[in-house]
Amino acid sequence: MNDLMLDKSALLFGVSKYLEKGIITGNVLIHKSLLAELERESNDGLVSAEIALDEVKKLKDITERILVNFEIVGDDSKKGEANELSREYCLEKGCIIVTADETQKKICDAMGIQYNFLQPLKQGLSFESFFDDETMSLHIKEDTVPRAKKGKPGNWKFVNLSDKPMLSTDVRMIANEIINAVRLIKGSFVEIERRGSLIIQLGNYRVVITRPPLSDGWEITITRPVVRKRLEDYNLDERLIKRLEERAEGIIIAGAPGMGKTTFAQALAEYYMRLGKIVKTIESPRDMHLPPEITQYSKNYAEIGELHDILLLSRPDYTVYDEMRNDEDFKLYVDLRLAGVGMVGVVHATSPIDAIHRFVNRVDIGTIPNILDTIIFINSGNVSKVYTLEMTVKVPAGLKEADLARPVVEIKDLATGNTEYEIYVFGEQTMIVPVNRGITMSNMEFKISKIVNNIIPNATVKYEDGEYVIVIPKEEIGKYNRKLVQRLKRLEKKNNIKIKIKLSD
């Protein structure tokens, strides 16, 4: 009887099924170095190692049942990778390596080692039985009933799929099945593996697996796009279509989670491709379903600097940046936009103004219109608001005196052409102010506020009955010091005005 040396890829491929069905036969060997590697990885919280160790236990049970040997072999004191030590052992003892790894197969060919390359078994995925045409996502967690989110973006409900809670072994079995299927289904890959979590793109499914200690139990979330739209399906305003074709190069697609931002970004990327533009994407994970003409880059497999260099050298007309979350993401968007690359960013936000706030805190006001020119807000799968940004020099709405003119970014509703918000620097703070609720303040009030607010931030200034009244909160009266009194007296004398102090209740 042959001796079969299993590698990690065989364990993750579900080799126990092949043994149980009689597709491969022989004594089962596992090298000590592989067990040591799996132990280290499991202690580091890697889900794949946990799944591989579960498979080892399953193999031990099956070999006892079908009466073949199960043996841990080799010398774990030798230094080297588990695959390398397994090959050395097989060369010495004449064993057959069982693998599902193309690289391992090529090395065995080169070294003249016998191998058995596992071919996929024709079988479906058990979790697919939970999906129907309306299912957006499946939520499985140990000791709870499986649930599904059904409907469409912005109009969905949670549905229990069973009355019986799933056991930890059931959840782990589904996780095992998913990891095994990564090598079988075209377009599948492990996107990220961290301590306690695993993110997989499995064909059309995006899978997130978590385990203790990261989560309080084994949990699997599987999402699937319910709708795939073309840009024409959104029935967009002709003015927006024209802007997207001719002017928009700093685009932000904003919306709450699950509202259809990525679906719209996907439709826009395909639209630009049909216009003959070169389009690339940056994703984490890569879950957009796009034609092969559009290259999709993963943020998890490259440093931000590397992506920056690649995108500048490959000269795309547009780059779609899905899921912008942290400072690095926004910095890359800004750098590429200022370098002349058309950018489409996807941002979580509860309103279009919240999306602009994310940039206001990171860049100078003067560069905002060069970075952003079009904000598209998605709600319930549809475009609900479009803003454009333009820079001008004017007195902000609500300020009265002509010498308060300053650079102002106007945020206009594309549909009406009306300015709804203004961005400008007030004192030392960059503010986004609704035009219909602007700050009403004269030049003198502004000067007094600037002096007082440096020392008493919560104080307010108003003009009434021929006097300028400074209203100070009672708890901050201690900050009203001699230096401030002297400055206000000088201002009174110089401008022939009267300033009065009043405590707020």
Curated annotation (Swiss-Prot):
Domain of life from the UniProt record: Archaea
Catalytic activity from the UniProt record: ATP + H2O = ADP + phosphate + H(+)
Keyword Magnesium appears in the UniProt entry: no
Positions in coiled-coil regions: none
Activity across pH: Optimum pH is 8.0-9.0 for ATPase activity.
Domain named PINc: residues: 2-106
Keyword presence, Disulfide bond: no
EC number(s) on file: 3.6.4.12
Renumbered residue ranges of the record's region Required for maximum interaction with Hjc and Hjm: 493-505
Residue segments, region KH domain: 434-505
Alphabetical UniProt keywords: ATP-binding, DNA damage, DNA recombination, DNA repair, DNA-binding, Hydrolase, Nucleotide-binding
A GO molecular-function descriptor: DNA binding
InterPro entries with a match to the protein in the record: Nucleic_acid_metab_PIN/TRAM (IPR052041), P-loop_NTPase (IPR027417), PIN_dom (IPR002716)
Co-factor binding details: Ca(2+) stimulates ATPase activity more than Mn(2+) or Mg(2+).
Biological role: Promotes Holliday junction (HJ) branch migration and unwinds Y-shaped DNA (but not replication forks or dsDNA) in an ATP hydrolysis-dependent manner. Stimulates cleavage by HJ resolvase Hjc. Unwinds Y-shaped and 3'-flap DNA substrates. In the absence of other proteins stabilizes replication forks (prevents spontaneous unwinding); Hjc, Hjm (Hel308) and PINA coordinate HJ migration and cleavage of replication forks in a coordinated way. Inhibits the 5'-3' (but not 3'-5') helicase activity of helicase Hjm (Hel308) on overhang DNA.
Oligomeric form and interacting partners: Homohexamer; the central pore (25-31 Angstroms) is large enough to hold dsDNA. In PDB:5F4H two of the 6 subunits are in an ATP-binding competent conformation. Interacts with Holliday junction resolvase Hjc; in the presence of HJ DNA this interaction decreases branch migration but not Y-DNA unwinding. Interacts with helicase Hjm (hel308) which decreases the DNA helicase activity of Hjm.
NCBIfam families: PRK13764.1
Domain notes: The C-terminus (residues 434-505) forms a novel KH fold; this domain binds ssDNA but is not sufficient on its own to interact with Hjm. It is probably destabilized in the homohexamer.
Listed name of the protein: Holliday junction branch migration ATPase PINA
Species whose genome carries this gene: Saccharolobus islandicus (strain REY15A)
Lineage: Archaea, Thermoproteota, Thermoprotei, Sulfolobales, Sulfolobaceae
